[in-house]
Amino acid sequence: MSGSKGFRTPDASDKPERGEVNLSLRTVQRMLPLVQRIVDDILACQKAVVQLQPQEASLDRQKRELAWPERARRYQIKEEMAQADISLQDALSELRDLGVVLLDSEQGRVGFPTLVNNRRAYFSWHPGEDGLHSWQFADEDVTRPIPLAWLKEISYSGKA
């Protein structure tokens, strides 16, 4: 890999074929800080909606009897929920634009598409992990640790 600027293998190219994105481990490691922030935004939006839904439901049931302050609060909650939904859709769109897949919306687990032995796979990460440690085949739920050999190839090819 002398002279190579990035980690490349035949199984993991940054160039999409047939519209599919295949990310190298090196690229995924560089993308991770941005994706972490996007996932944090997604989880915050979901939490906001979950917290506002009971208030909205309660005020909606009483909407004909509400005094102005409660009615104003009902409108405010609806606006906050709409804004949270817009922010959520924006964050999901950012992930899609990066080629990243949301594998578990409750946990915030994401998959970075790649190929392993010519099979569709994901490098996976979720909030709470201090870095990228696992991967899985796209058609399986079983996560596997990233082999040390893959990590060594990155360190041999330059700064990780």
Model-predicted regions and their roles:
Residues 1-62:
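Long, hydrophobic N-terminal alpha-helical segment
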Residues 3-4, 10-13, 18, 23-24, ...:
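Mixed-charge, polar/low-complexity N-terminal
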Residues 8, 18, 26, 30, ...:
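Arginine residue identity/basic-tract feature
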Residues 38-41, 45-48, 52-55, 59, ...:
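Amphipathic coiled-coil alpha-helices
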Residues 54-80, 101-122:
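Charge-rich, acidic-biased intrinsically disordered regions
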Residues 89-160:
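Glycine-rich, aromatic-bearing surface loops/beta-hairpins
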